[in-house]
Swiss-Prot record:
Hydrolyzes a variety of simple alpha-D-galactoside as well as more complex molecules such as oligosaccharides and polysaccharides. This is Probable alpha-galactosidase A. The gene is aglA. It comes from Aspergillus oryzae (strain ATCC 42149 / RIB 40) (Yellow koji mold). Residues 1-25 form the signal peptide. GO terms for cellular component: extracellular region. It catalyses: Hydrolysis of terminal, non-reducing alpha-D-galactose residues in alpha-D-galactosides, including galactose oligosaccharides, galactomannans and galactolipids.
């Protein structure tokens, strides 16, 4: 059986005859107001995909509670197609793998209440060596529309710069072209971009930062770094999760409703993971408001796996309409503490034990941006129990386990000040302020590394709250707060922290210097809630 080889008319698949304005995805958050949830075959099955797998997965998700919990997307990955295009240039599915065809499969998936997604590549070949979309973008968009596809994952293998363009510029051209085509469709596809991943593993991260700057303008989500470990892969699955987790902490400033940072799939049945580690991946991804795309053998998921994957309290966090990504409030050799706001006015705190031993400790409320003069209700989002807290939350965690609490505030104690680490994303070093010096040090969890940033851009440490981060020439120090321009800072989407008086940017190691373009030493992560200038 051959594919549909007669293209549908361009006016039917793309925009109508009326002009359509091409807008950035972040300007149209209604296309994907919350991060996607669903299934993708890649990390579990790679190229071993077929119709039976997707039918059985669809049936299982419809009956085991995953669809009801919100996992409503069924997405194919690489290797679904033939090695050659049809004579008219259109893609053809592999009839051995999909004997009834992708239009039939799409109809089946949708009859069960799911959306249907597909994979292509922006280069001349996919990562598996199948036909890429370069030069065929409009043809492929038309055929995807004809098949009922509503989600496109566009990979970035086999991209080579044309004359006059750098590699980064070539990716921008290809993904920008796809954005224009998809934006003109009567029913635009959700656009998942993989471009940043191809720039994430270099020492000089300027191109990676640059790609991250433009992907929110073109699509609804972007894979920012390396692939998560596949089921048959060698190495530590936990280390792989931690690698992608750490990359995600570097890019929080980009996320907003309509665009989501994607740290890759939930590997829920990987044999190398303990239950605590699986639960941690889910809790961290939910705290990030990251895509929750499961790559596992769904029919064989255990009751324990299904229990955490369908945790409604954590799914509600993931799907919170603010879409604010949790950021680091504190980090040391064992614990990461992350915080964010939720749309109902509550505060989320997520505590990860990434160390090798169990730990029991108190998490002080002031590092969460909350007042220690107030009393709060804290709900454990794993078990559902609620406790009254005043100064701190007492936590006890196994190695590689994660706790998540939702802290309710009342009118008297509703003020939350963005609080947490200011860290250089290239070195991982934390800005550290004492009365004698301000510089960059390894993150150690001390309050001299935990900063509060108010709405006017004034920055102070928790350890010395009467003193503010001050620029004088190219030097920085803590000085008594006076709210002069030397103590006011602005944070840009590029990651630059710029002083209002000098016009210089904070630079790793201490001090300020002339602002460069996406230079490693001047890109910083700041707490969620700080205003980001676009």
């Amino acid at each position: 059986m051959r594919l549909i080889t007669r293209w549908i008319p361009l006016a039917n698949a793309l925009a109508s005859t009326m002009p359509v304005q091409v807008v950035a995805s972040i300007e149209n958050p209604s296309l994907l107001p919350t991060p996607p949830m669903g299934f993708n075959n890649w990390a579990r099955f790679m190229c071993d995909l077929n119709e039976t797998l997707f039918v059985e997965t669809t049936d299982a998700m419809a009956s085991n509670g995953l669809l009801e919990a919100g996992y409503n997307r069924i997405n194919l990955d690489d290797c679904w197609m033939n090695y050659d295009r049809a004579e008219n240039g259109s893609l053809e599915w592999n009839v051995t793998k999909f004997p009834r065809g992708l239009p039939w499969l799409g109809q089946y998936v949708k009859s069960k209440g799911f959306n249907f997604g597909i994979y292509e590549d922006s280069g001349n070949l996919t990562c598996g060596g199948y036909p890429g979309s370069e030069g065929y973008e409009e043809i492929d968009a038309e055929i995807f529309a004809a098949w009922g596809i509503d989600y496109l994952k566009l990979d970035g293998c086999n991209v080579y710069p044309k004359e006059g363009r750098t590699l980064q510029e070539e990716y921008k051209y290809l993904y920008g072209n796809w954005h224009e085509i998809l934006s003109k469709m009567q029913q635009p596809l959700i656009f998942s971009e993989s471009a940043p991943a191809y720039f994430s593993m270099t020492d000089n991260l300027t191109d990676w930062h640059t790609v991250m700057d433009w992907v929110p303008e073109y699509g609804e989500l972007a894979r920012h770094s390396v692939d998560i470990l596949v089921y048959s892969g060698e190495g530590s699955a936990w280390d792989s999760i931690m690698t992608n987790y750490k990359f995600n902490t570097l890019v929080a400033r980009y996320q907003r409703p309509g665009y989501y940072n994607d740290p890759d799939f939930l590997i829920a049945d990987h044999p190398g993971l303990s239950l605590d580690e699986k639960r941690s991946q889910f809790a961290l991804w939910a705290s990030f408001s990251a895509p929750l795309i499961i790559s596992a053998h769904i029919p064989d998921l255990s009751s324990e796996d299904l229990e955490y994957l369908t945790n409604q309290a954590l799914i509600a966090v993931d799907q919170d309409p603010l879409a604010q990504q949790a950021t680091l409030a504190s980090r040391d050799g064992s614990l990461d503490v992350l915080t964010r706001n939720l749309a109902d006015g509550s505060r989320l705190v997520t505590i990860l034990n990434h160390g090798s031993e169990s730990i029991e400790t108190d998490i002080s409320l002031d590092i969460l941006g909350l007042s220690t003069d107030c009393t709060y209700k804290a709900q454990d989002l794993w078990g559902g129990s609620t406790q009254t807290i005043k100064d701190a939350i007492r936590i006890k965690l196994n190695t590689h386990a994660t706790a998540v609490y939702k802290i309710d505030t009342d009118e008297k104690c509703s003020q939350v000040i963005p609080t947490g680490l200011i860290f250089n994303t290239a070195s991982g070093k934390c800005l550290t302020g004492t009365s004698s010096s301000v510089g960059s040090e390894s993150c150690n969890g001390s309050k001299s590394q935990i900063w509060q940033i108010d709405a006017s851009g004034v920055i102070r440490t928790l350890s010395e709250q009467s003193k503010c981060l001050t620029a004088d020439g190219k030097a920085i120090s803590l000085q008594e707060c006076s709210e002069n321009n030397g103590q006011k800072w602005s944070y840009a989407i590029t990651g630059n922290l710029k002083n209002a008086d000098t016009g210089y940017c904070l630079t790793n190691g201490g001090g300020v210097s002339a602002c460069g373009f996406e230079t490693n030493s001047q890109v910083f992560g700041l707490p969620a809630g700080v205003h980001v200038a676009l």
